[in-house]
Amino acid sequence: MRRARSGDLIADVGGVAVRVHEWLDLDPPDTMLDPAKLGRLVAGLHRVPFVGSVGQDPWYAEPVGAGQWAALLMSLRARSAPFADELAALVPEILALEELLGEPARALRTCHRDLWADNLRVASGGGLSVFDFDNAGLADPSQELAAVLVEYASADPAKARLIRDAYNEAGGPGRVERSQDFAMPIAQLHHIVEAGCRRWLVAETDAGRADNEAWVREFLDRPLTRSRIEALLVE
């Protein structure tokens, strides 16, 4: 890290010169963000006049599938995974949700595609800060808005309404109107769980297994279900 003549900080990151324009102190991840600020921020992201060309990714659109879930559960049980029975109990619901996947996107534009609480936080000045755009690419803004409702409204229709209203008033182009609009969070959460399970299976230390079990339990403790989606669709 060195300073430019202007006093700005410059760092070499993988052979690329990167200049730091501003430091931000961020609060820890929090799903209880102000719904109006949140809705306006997501609308602002979706109104940026840039379509982009980084293509769609199966991670956000395609199911894991019944066969893969069955094989994964067999492996987890063979290794006595402590969460195997809890996951098995959710598989019927998981498969029912995966039946909602497969419809073409209503609209495509570059979206962040990872607006979970780890990447959207309150900054020291009280505003919201979005970072980690590594996964940005083409997606349906309606589906990204649905993912925001899942993360920050949980199953609270009133809070979901506040987020949607603020988003609409700020000119956001997405609309969450039906269960199929939740395709992005359904696919993404299921792939996250699958990845956590596979990492648990190959982990060689207790710490590694504990870390990946925690990943899986984030979903097990607050699963996305059809009833939760129905609650978020209430006007």
Question: Where in the sequence are the language-model features?
Answer:
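Active-site acidic catalytic loop and adjacent metal/ATP-binding pocket
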Residues: 1, 98-144
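Conserved structural core of kinase catalytic domains
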Residues: 5-34
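A cross-family kinase active-site recognition segment
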Residues: 28-85, 106-108
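ATP/Mg2+ or Mg2+-diphosphate-binding catalytic cores
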Residues: 71-82, 194-235
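Active-site activation/catalytic loop segments of kinase-like enzymes and analogous catalytic loops
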Residues: 141-173, 187-204
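All-alpha amphipathic helical-bundle segments outside canonical DNA-binding/catalytic cores
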Residues: 174-185
